[in-house]
Curated annotation (Swiss-Prot):
Keywords: Carbohydrate metabolism, Cytoplasm, Isomerase, Magnesium, Metal-binding, Xylose metabolism. NCBIfam families: PRK05474.1, xylose_isom_A. This is Xylose isomerase. GO terms for cellular component: cytoplasm. GO terms for biological process: D-xylose metabolic process. The keyword 4Fe-4S does not apply. It is found in: Cytoplasm. PANTHER family: PTHR48408, XYLOSE ISOMERASE (PTHR48408:SF1). The active site is at residues 100, 103. It comes from Ruegeria pomeroyi (strain ATCC 700808 / DSM 15171 / DSS-3). Belongs to the xylose isomerase family. One of its GO terms (molecular function) is xylose isomerase activity. It catalyses: alpha-D-xylose = alpha-D-xylulofuranose.
Amino acid sequence: MTEFFADIAPVRYEGPDSANPLAFRHYDPDEMVMGKRMEDHLRFAVAYWHSFAWEGGDPFGGQTLIRPWHPQDDMTRAKVKADAAFEMFDILGVPYFCWHDADIRPEAATFAESLRNFEEIIDHFLAKMESRRTRLLWGTANMFSHRRWMAGASTNPDPDVFAYAAATVKTCLDATQRMGGQNYVLWGGREGYETLLNTDMGRELDHMGRFLSMVVDYKHKIGFKGAILVEPKPQEPSKHQYDFDAATCIGFLRKYGLEGEVKLNLEQGHAILAGHSFEHEIAVAASEGMLGSIDMNRNDYQSGWDTDQFPNNVPEVALCYYHILRAGGFTTGGTNFDAKLRRQSLDATDLIAAHVGGMDICARGLKAAAAMIEDGGLETALRDRYAGWDSDHGQGILESDLDSLFARVLAGEIDPQPHSGRQEMLENHVNRFV
């Protein structure tokens, strides 16, 4: 056991009246919600990169977090970091975690040496998992931090970088399968451009489509049963990223014939950067049958930055889970806390408290969403609003043509009168539950 979490006891559910800052007030994993355990609805995961690899730096300052596994440049400390991570998983009782390859192993001088480090730490993970319940929700490759990726991975103008990216994803998908991961995620932080002056957009998109097809082909070759997910984000670190939002990704997947093979991993902060609400992105993906998993966090609404803070807004979270539940809930996906401490939150207890708070907020949101579904008021309002389309009259309009509809309108047979959308009443209805 490491010393980092030595004085912190496992977090327990103590109910809403508890004053214990390291206790769950709302998250009871065994509580039944719509006939299913709360844990099985939410499927919480810890993000290895923010919780264990991030050192507290920002664009104006360096490291603020001092950990026993720093500096992160050798395998001995990588294993110390892994040991601490699994201790935190035990303390929180989370069923899943997620990683990038660069989070868990030090970068070496060659690809082969980095791969040896990677495989060694995967072996270490598997040994830890033998006596624990925490499993891998998804793995992914970091193809945005190292300078080789500065002009992209699959969209790079250098074909050798494309090949290096392919080799990297192969190793990460292999490791994800070894660990029993339920998904594999691709996020293209550098798959975009800084300026169109040196960018052949059509070629880059074709290369990105070909790359994703190669990933899908390899998934089937090795028999990986999990889902392949892509994660939208409009910008940061690139000026413009090709996977701008859910709708853009869906159009991309359809263009390259991948809509039956790939789903979406959606993040709250990325939705905000794209000018959307999180429930908008979830609803878009769900409407196309492409909702895979979510990264739960929040942004700073004043600065506009992608600050990756832990969630604390119950009404927002409730509406997210409302759309997830309406879509049937998660299958292979879950709720990954893609969130990090503030750079002044230095202690191990801060890391635990942040996750406890986030898990409680999600539990409250889930219960509110379930209550709204069971109440049925929103569904009734929706059904009434579109009832005209379910009538013979509405179906006849859909099956008609422009000339026929023109004639009916001209004859005065059709003279529409507006109806109230009742937005304020519906907002008040939601407020009864949150």
